[in-house]
């Protein structure tokens, strides 16, 4: 891995110039989890939350989060996303919900930040819709699981050390 790219020689923050980079298909997959009380999990699983379809609303929020990443992260490039796929996995054993987001574009820079933002916004929406019954929910283990495309090539979390 090279040095930090968002700082110039004088140490000032700047947006990286990607103008000379080749356009390629870029994919990133991120994942995160929200743990909750069994009763809260049952409300989500059974579709009985007072605010409505928790995972349906969270899916739309995650998609919107991916699309708005450049507005939230100061040095992120605004990207024309070609796909945002959001999946929720109910986990009885936790109990909790896993959110997996795949973001794609055809461009000059990766979509890892968009995938991470989408996961966080989706899980924050679950929290918001259920906080009246469970203020102790915990969002955890948010990470990039995979990235494809670009000069640095493909990467999977299991390839990382530690």
UniProtKB/Swiss-Prot annotation:
One Pfam family name is MoaC
What are the alphabetically sorted keywords of the record? Answer: Lyase, Molybdenum cofactor biosynthesis
Q: Is Lyase set as a keyword in this record?
A: yes
Known Gene3D superfamilies for this protein? Molybdopterin cofactor biosynthesis C (MoaC) domain
| Gene Ontology molecular function terms on file | cyclic pyranopterin monophosphate synthase activity
Which residues are recorded as binding substrate? 75-77, 113-114
User: EC class of this enzyme?
Assistant: lyase
EC annotation from Swiss-Prot or TrEMBL: 4.6.1.17
Q: Which BP terms from GO are recorded?
A: Mo-molybdopterin cofactor biosynthetic process
Keyword Lyase recorded = yes
Alphabetized CDD domains for the sequence: MoaC_PE (cd01420)
- Please write the reaction equations for the catalytic activity of this protein: (8S)-3',8-cyclo-7,8-dihydroguanosine 5'-triphosphate = cyclic pyranopterin phosphate + diphosphate
Q: Locate the active site.
A: 128
PANTHER family attached to this UniProt entry: CYCLIC PYRANOPTERIN MONOPHOSPHATE SYNTHASE, MOLYBDOPTERIN COFACTOR SYNTHESIS PROTEIN A
Question: Assembly and partners?
Answer: Homohexamer; trimer of dimers.
Q: What protein name applies here?
A: Cyclic pyranopterin monophosphate synthase
Protein's organism: Burkholderia cenocepacia (strain HI2424)
Q: What is the lineage of its organism?
A: Bacteria, Pseudomonadati, Pseudomonadota, Betaproteobacteria, Burkholderiales
Q: Which gene encodes it?
A: moaC
């Amino acid at each position: 891995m090279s040095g930090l790219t968002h700082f110039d020689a004088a140490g000032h923050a700047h947006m990286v110039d990607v103008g000379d980079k080749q356009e390629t298909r870029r994919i990133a997959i991120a994942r995160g989890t929200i743990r909750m009380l069994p009763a809260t999990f049952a409300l989500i699983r059974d579709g009985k939350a007072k605010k409505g379809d928790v995972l349906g609303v969270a899916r739309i929020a995650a998609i919107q989060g991916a699309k708005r990443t450049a507005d939230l992260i100061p040095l992120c490039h605004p990207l024309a996303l070609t796909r945002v796929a959001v999946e929720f996995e109910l986990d009885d054993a936790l109990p909790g919900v896993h959110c997996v987001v795949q973001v794609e574009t055809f461009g000059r820079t990766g979509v890892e930040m968009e995938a991470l933002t989408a996961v966080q916004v989706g899980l924050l929406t679950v929290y918001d819709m259920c906080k009246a019954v469970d203020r102790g929910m915990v969002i955890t283990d948010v990470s990039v699981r995979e990235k494809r495309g670009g000069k640095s090539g493909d990467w999977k979390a299991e390839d990382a050390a530690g």
